[in-house]
């Protein structure tokens, strides 16, 4: 084992670029000193010819006389110097000769595959082998030969793989010792043979290895039945793979390609350091073994080949009809190549050169390809820059007669632009070809962004990107921003001239800059001039109320903050007059209420709500008493005033903090004690003084009054009686009493009876109408289509009826505050409302049916409620907030979409119609970018994919039925025509969206998910055309006639072919040939990632929008 104190250096290098792993066939183990001299430090070098072998590195180990692989596999990287002699290599150098003896190997690190072996002996060995390795075929006879260097009167012993094999008496030993092996077999004869004198140390032995192919000569394979190729120039057929293992200096399928002097490796890309390869032993994978480089021979490869011989170990004889014999190449003839001049030369031809556009400061990678006979070698192809600097290739790959060299230039500058040359040099000629390198400067805006609007939590900025310096086109626009007091920048990618920054801090200054990017790596330019803008002040919490819940609890509530106000709340509460009872609570931004518990009964508490955004402002507060734990006291300070002949005013005081909810007055005539009248009056929470006017009293009559109060614990004791004496009858009163008492009683009696009758009739009608509506909803929800085609269980197996299993979130009528009408049709209406749900206030869109809506309209409306309940939440489907029934009408509250429906949103983006000056100034036909339009389409596809997975059919998919919510997310809405089956056949004809309907729906009233895909294709056309009317100018009758004949919507002028191809796939006549929504989503996702302009919104000459025909849309 190579210990740390015996190794001066153990270095490992790997090429860390992406690529395939190193193969053992690409590895060469170089042994510079098989016989170790005391004068030199022994070493080994393992080289891989695969320079693109990312992550896989080489490891060296020892196998004989002791397996010591783990330490030799350790190492560190070479220092990165240019040029490196071998881009992927491992080397080891010993400081002690005693450890540099035995059999060593090289393999791929962490691999259990094949190894490449070499051997080292000490110079004091008494014998030397004829060669380090001997390769024979199965069944052949061979002599393992050694030469004696030192004489000793002792017997010799031969060990094989460390075990005794043979010994010779001293009398039989000559200067050349032969150990014969007959009928060689791999399993019994292959191995390491070491010879020494019997008394000598094992480390003084001479080593050679016998490699026995498992097949007879000329064959390979598991059964040795496959014929080997004719391996030329000393190549050996691999008995496992059938490949020719080529000697160093040759390559090709049959080793017929000559590399020349000083080259080695699988592709002849490696060069010896001195260019000569003298005194180096090259070892390859079995069954080749070890040999000298081409042109050299001997155990240490120090001897040149004699005349007439060439190749590795000088084993090949020149047979040259013409020309001369070169010991490195074989026969050398003018105009021909090959070891026997069997191939005619052809001039190299450079191909695949392309002009290059690159951004300044990035690395340029250029491939130069040249073909010829013989194919150019690594180093034959060079790159010459525009300023005549020559650059060497970092790697070369050769396939057949074509070689491709890879060049890399760090940090290209503008001065490097111009005509570059790819040059090929060989022994006979030089050819070159030119290409253009354009170096672009990334763009930088010249003006800062401009503020267009602001709020407490947002800024709306005009990017102001033109004019800019540098080169276009502009690929992406990024807005950089940070608080003025911070150091870290945030960024958002812009998809139009305006950018809205949300979730900002109120009353904060923000530093903003615009950064432009052009296509390609390094295309991001420097940020433009900075501008500082401030967000606005947030409004304080409003509607703060504190109310009693129990004797020990209060409820504090306030109106929920606007959507963009995300500040937290701090609530401080204390008992009145007791500062030591202060309690503080921290609440999140979506809070609008909190319960206070563990309080004292009959105590007053004060609470203040502070907003984290309203620093330095006065904050609202409220106070309330907890409910009482005892009966209330009777009213106090009772007084009577403003007495007349028929009336009087009664005032009294209510005790504070006693939770009094009602006050009761009982009064009677003094002379008629059996007739008593009683009045109950509600007491407001903070009301301490009360007033009541007694009317209809008798003149000149005495009355006795008593009062008491009621709270959560019960009634108080009665107050002491209070006397009242009315004044004598006035003259006008007497006259009226004499002549009008009877008439008054008749009028009052008749009016009372009439009111009672009307009230009773109204209650009966209301109850009947409510029962009728409930029965209608239940019957609608239970109604099933006439024909089903579904993989789900048949209808009679369904558990109960739909209406009984339907559970929807209920809203209270008192929790809905209507604000405005958002839209209405012939039979329905949508209103904007503010609702309270789960203690929180939020915006909502509330839908209701009009009085004269038909049975079908009510069925579709109730069906929409059922579909939304069964679908559940999804980010691309409008969310159901709740439902409410009031006076026999059903109200449906859904998520409020601030940007309206997609169709109107697209048409509003037609800026050439709404703001021509802006359109011309910014050369755009729409405020929406290609990315935004594709994002809308992807959102709808994602929602429809979820809908189809739930086995629901929409039946009315169109841009008008898609809403644009917060952050411009598209959400599918209007499920009034949806059904929960895979196939639905409509049994009646109603209003039909003909322009969006599939052929099978028009002809046979069949609706499936595939028909929804057709409708999606039309929706995609609407998005690309910015809200155009499908088949504008055509009637529905013409559509019925032309669609079955193959007529389809024309491609919009601003539409990419790939997007229109997706539309056409959706409009295929056979439903099963149309793509699924998941496939559509996959295609759109890929388009979004590529950031290509699939929908061109640039304003070009004679630009026209797709036509809009509202009357045609209403007709279908």
Swiss-Prot record:
Repeat recorded as keyword: yes
Q: What does the record give as EC number?
A: 2.7.10.1
The chemistry this enzyme catalyses reads:
L-tyrosyl-[protein] + ATP = O-phospho-L-tyrosyl-[protein] + ADP + H(+)
The entry's keywords: ATP-binding, Cell junction, Cell membrane, Cytoplasm, Cytoskeleton, Disulfide bond, EGF-like domain, Glycoprotein, Immunoglobulin domain, Kinase, Membrane, Nucleotide-binding, Phosphoprotein, Receptor, Repeat, Signal, Transferase, Transmembrane, Transmembrane helix, Tyrosine-protein kinase
> Quick one: where is this thing mainly located?
membrane
Q: Which GO CC terms are listed, alphabetically?
A: cytoplasm; cytoskeleton; focal adhesion; plasma membrane; receptor complex
Where do the Ig-like C2-type domain residues begin and end? 46-126, 348-438
Q: Which family does it belong to?
A: Belongs to the protein kinase superfamily. Tyr protein kinase family. Tie subfamily.
- This chain belongs to the protein called Angiopoietin-1 receptor
Q: Which organism is it from?
A: Danio rerio (Zebrafish)
Q: What is the lineage of its organism?
A: Eukaryota, Metazoa, Chordata, Craniata, Vertebrata
């Amino acid at each position: 084992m190579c210990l740390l104190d015996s190794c001066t250096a153990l270095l490992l290098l790997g090429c860390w670029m992406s690529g395939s792993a190193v193969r053992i066939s690409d590895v060469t183990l170089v042994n510079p000193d098989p016989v170790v001299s005391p004068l030199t430090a022994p070493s080994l070098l393992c080289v891989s010819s695969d320079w693109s072998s990312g992550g896989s590195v080489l490891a060296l180990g020892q196998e004989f006389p002791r397996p010591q692989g783990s330490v030799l596999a350790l190492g560190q990287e070479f220092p990165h110097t240019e040029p490196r002699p071998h881009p992927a290599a491992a080397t080891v150098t010993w400081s002690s000769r005693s450890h540099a003896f035995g059999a060593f190997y090289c393999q791929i690190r962490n691999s259990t595959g094949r190894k490449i072996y070499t051997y080292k002996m000490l110079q004091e060995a008494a014998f030397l082998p004829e060669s380090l390795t001997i390769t024979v075929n199965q069944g052949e006879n061979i002599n393992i030969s050694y030469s004696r260097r030192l004489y000793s009167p002792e017997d010799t012993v031969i060990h094989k793989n460390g075990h005794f094999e043979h010994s010779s008496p001293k009398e039989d030993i000559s200067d050349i010792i032969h150990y014969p092996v007959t009928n060689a077999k791999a399993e019994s004869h292959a191995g390491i043979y070491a010879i020494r004198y019997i008394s000598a140390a094992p480390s003084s032995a001479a080593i050679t290895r016998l490699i026995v192919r498992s097949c007879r000569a000329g064959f390979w394979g598991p059964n040795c039945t496959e014929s080997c190729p004719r391996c030329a120039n000393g190549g050996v057929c691999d008995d496992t793979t059938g490949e020719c293992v080529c000697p160093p200096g040759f390559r090709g399928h049959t080793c017929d390609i000559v590399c020349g002097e000083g080259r080695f490796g699988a592709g002849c890309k490696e060069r010896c350091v001195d260019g000569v390869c003298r005194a180096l032993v090259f070892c390859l994978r079995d069954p080749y073994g070890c040999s000298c480089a081409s042109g050299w021979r001997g155990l240490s490869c120090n001897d040149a080949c004699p005349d007439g011989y060439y190749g590795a170990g000088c084993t090949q004889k020149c047979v040259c009809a013409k020309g001369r014999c070169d010991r490195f190449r074989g026969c050398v003839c003018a105009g021909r190549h090959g070891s026997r001049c069997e191939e005619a030369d052809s001039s190299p031809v450079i191909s695949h050169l392309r002009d290059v556009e690159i951004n300044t400061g990035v690395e340029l990678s250029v491939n130069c390809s040249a073909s010829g006979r013989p194919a150019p070698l690594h180093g034959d192809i060079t790159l010459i820059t525009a300023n005549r600097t020559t650059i060497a290739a970092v790697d070369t790959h050769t396939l057949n007669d074509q070689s491709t060299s890879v060049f890399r230039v760090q940090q290209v500058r503008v001065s490097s632009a111009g005509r570059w040359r790819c040059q090929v040099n060989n022994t006979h000629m030089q050819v070159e070809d030119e290409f253009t390198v354009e170096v672009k400067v990334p763009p930088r805006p010249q003006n800062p962004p401009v503020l267009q609007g602001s709020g407490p939590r947002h800024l709306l900025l005009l990017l102001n990107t033109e004019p800019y310096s540098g080169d276009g086109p502009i690929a992406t626009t990024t807005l950089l921003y940070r608080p003025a007091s911070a150091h870290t920048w945030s960024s958002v990618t812009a998809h139009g001239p305006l950018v809205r920054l949300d979730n900002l801090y109120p009353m904060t200054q923000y530093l903003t800059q615009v950064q432009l990017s052009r296509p390609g790596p390094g295309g991001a330019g420097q940020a433009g001039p900075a501008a500082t803008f401030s967000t606005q002040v947030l409004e304080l919490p409003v509607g703060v109320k504190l109310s009693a819940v129990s004797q020990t609890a209060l409820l504090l509530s306030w109106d929920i903050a606007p959507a963009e106000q995300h500040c937290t709340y701090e609530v401080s509460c204390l008992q009145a007059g007791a500062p030591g009872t202060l309690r503080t609570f921290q609440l999140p931004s979506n809070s609008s209420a909190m319960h206070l518990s563990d309080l004292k009964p009959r105590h007053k508490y004060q609470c203040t709500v502070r907003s984290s955004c309203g620093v330095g402002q006065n904050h609202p507060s409220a106070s309330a008493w907890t409910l009482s734990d005892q009966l209330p006291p009777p009213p106090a300070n009772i007084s009577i005033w403003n007495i007349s002949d028929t009336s009087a005013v009664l005032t009294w005081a209510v005790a504070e903090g006693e939770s009094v909810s009602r006050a009761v007055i009982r009064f009677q005539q003094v002379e008629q004690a059996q007739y008593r009248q009683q009045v109950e009056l509600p007491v407001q929470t903070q009301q301490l003084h009360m007033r009541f006017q007694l009317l209809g009293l008798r003149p000149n009559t005495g009355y006795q009054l008593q009062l008491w109060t009621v709270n959560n614990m019960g009634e108080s004791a009665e107050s002491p009686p209070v006397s009242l004496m009315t004044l004598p009858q006035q003259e006008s009163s007497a006259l009226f009493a004499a002549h009008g008492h009877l008439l008054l009683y008749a009028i009052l009696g008749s009016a009372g009876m009439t009111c009672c009758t009307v009230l009773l009739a109204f209650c009966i009608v209301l109850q009947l109408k409510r029962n009728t509506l409930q029965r209608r909803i239940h019957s609608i929800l239970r109604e099933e289509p006439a024909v089903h085609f579904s993989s789900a269980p048949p209808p009679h197996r369904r558990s109960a009826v739909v209406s009984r299993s339907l559970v929807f979130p209920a809203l209270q009528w008192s929790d809905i505050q209507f604000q405005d009408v958002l839209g209405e049709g012939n039979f329905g209406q949508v209103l904007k409302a503010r609702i309270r749900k789960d203690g929180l206030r939020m915006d909502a869109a509330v839908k209701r049916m009009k009085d004269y809506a038909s049975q079908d309209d009510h069925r579709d409306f109730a069906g929409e409620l059922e579909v939304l309940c069964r679908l559940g939440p999804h980010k691309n489907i409008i969310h159901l907030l709740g439902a409410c029934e009031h006076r026999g009408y059903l109200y449906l509250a859904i998520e409020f979409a601030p940007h309206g429906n997609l169709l109107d949103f697209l048409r509003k983006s037609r800026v050439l119609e709404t703001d021509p000056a802006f359109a011309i100034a910014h050369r755009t036909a729409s405020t929406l970018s290609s990315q935004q339009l594709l994002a809308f389409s992807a959102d709808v596809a994602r929602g429809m994919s979820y809908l189809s997975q739930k086995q629901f059919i929409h039946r009315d998919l169109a841009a008008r039925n898609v809403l644009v919510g917060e952050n411009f997310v598209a959400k599918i809405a209007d499920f009034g025509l949806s059904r929960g089956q895979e196939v639905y056949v409509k049994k009646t004809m109603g209003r039909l969206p003909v322009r969006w309907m599939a052929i099978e729906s028009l002809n046979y009233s069949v609706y499936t998910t595939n028909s929804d895909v057709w409708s999606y294709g039309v929706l995609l056309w609407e998005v690309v055309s910015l809200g155009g009317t499908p088949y504008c100018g055509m009637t529905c009758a013409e559509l019925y006639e032309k669609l079955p004949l193959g007529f389809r919507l024309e491609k919009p002028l601003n539409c990419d072919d790939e997007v229109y191809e997706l539309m056409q796939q959706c409009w295929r006549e056979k439903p099963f040939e149309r793509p699924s929504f998941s496939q559509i989503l996959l295609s759109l996702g890929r388009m979004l990632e590529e950031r290509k302009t699939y929908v061109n919104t640039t304003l070009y000459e004679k630009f026209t929008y797709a036509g809009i025909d509202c009357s045609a849309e209403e007709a279908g």
